[in-house]
Amino acid sequence: MTNETWVQVREGLLKRVGRNNFVTWIEPLRLMGLDEGVARFEVPTLFFGDWVQRNFADHIRMRLTEAGSPVERLEFAVSNTPRAPLKEVKAAAPAASPARARPAPPEEDLRGAPLDARFTFDSFVVGKPNELAHAAARRVAEGGPVTFNPLFLYGGVGLGKTHLMHAIAHDLQKRQPGARVLYLSAEQFMYRFVQALREREILGFKELFRSVDVLMVDDVQFIAGKDSTQEEFFHTFNALVDQNKQIVISADRAPGEIKDLEERIKSRLQCGLVVDLHPTDYELRLGILQQKADFYREQYRGLVIADGVLEFLAHRITTNVRVLEGALTRLFAFASLVGREITLDLAQDCLADILRASDRKVTIEEIQRKVAEHYNIRLSDMIGPKRLRTIARPRQVAMYLAKQLTPRSLPEIGRRFGGRDHTTIMHGVRKIEELMATDSQLADDLQLLRRLLQA
């Protein structure tokens, strides 16, 4: 197989997998040889080879076969030496250009995700569900001595995690213009890591990330299951902590609940301050709507919003803040276009689809299924007679959630739990209420299940 043939195979793969996948996962491959139905490739890391094997092996085999070089399997090996032309190899991609000596990371290399100018502390509405997270973020933004490291913010979609991280970055840049503050998503961290591997600039990557004063990584759950990225993240984390540099992390769940995240990383993340942004309550939703409405009154001068509309929306739209703000944006835009006052009737007509989605009722059957999945028990045990602690406690959790999240009466809930008496349901509900005060794991379980059911 000639170099020209491999170039043609690569061109076919580009069309098949798309440019982003090609640049990230196919372009770095170096075909070292093809013999007895086995294509051998050199890859930057074992993780890289495993990923290509799982996601692109079929495409590569198909293109090689079409080019007249049928293969049965692919093999990947990591080379610790710089790439150079190998005369003995039957087919080889053009050699990569040699790695360049890299100076200290310049300021322009410290580019992360763009910060949203709207996401400041002034625009963040504080209420009971997020007051601790807000206070902790304010403390970090003051830029004083590092008191907790990392600050770990977690919660469901649209509860303010990203807003607070942007606000911290904005404040730090104002207070300390010379500080090296880097904010980016975990996906961007992985992409830049893979890019550094591909370009043989991993030392520059390490130097860049370990030279920052504040590292902020959003949605860290993204790196779960990605072994090489987790390895680099772990060492970057340790290096910054050793230098007493501030780290701020966010995720959609607590560190201990992130599946496939290495235990040593979970342990590190739990060493600092872990703060939950709880689902919004009525008062917080109303405050957010009032702030947003004040902003729109400036934009749409002369537009009138009737009494009770904001209260109605705060009661009805309980999913997350993004949906809530989006509903108000649509309402003001619609009223402006048609030249009408924003009344309750107009809101109901204009937002009918959002209101219908928000009206989705949680059923007892859904609760039983989610709780059974969470505790890894059979669904039939929810209504069965078994009294083992490993079954009885999840059953009581489901009873408690049925009482909290559905309008069903205790006798009706009892019937859905295998015909149990209403006093049994009441006992289960009270037992969970008592345990919540002392059992933090149970409280976390309930918070997670509630979010899953109301998502």
UniProtKB/Swiss-Prot annotation:
One biological process term in Gene Ontology: DNA replication initiation
CDD domains: AAA, Bac_DnaA_C
Signal peptide segment: none
Alphabetical list of Gene3D superfamilies matching this protein: 1.10.1750.10, 1.10.8.60, 3.30.300.180, P-loop containing nucleotide triphosphate hydrolases
SUPFAM superfamilies: P-loop containing nucleoside triphosphate hydrolases, TrpR-like
Keyword presence, ATP-binding: yes
Region listing for Domain II, in residue ranges: 70-113
Amino-acid positions noted as binding ATP in the UniProt annotation, renumbered to this chain: 158, 160-162
Annotated region (Disordered), positions in chain: 87-109
One cellular-component annotation, GO: cytoplasm
Record's comment describing the protein's domains: Domain I is involved in oligomerization and binding regulators, domain II is flexibile and of varying length in different bacteria, domain III forms the AAA+ region, while domain IV binds dsDNA.
Family recorded in the similarity comment: Belongs to the DnaA family.
Protein name according to UniProt: Chromosomal replication initiator protein DnaA
Gene from which the chain derives: dnaA
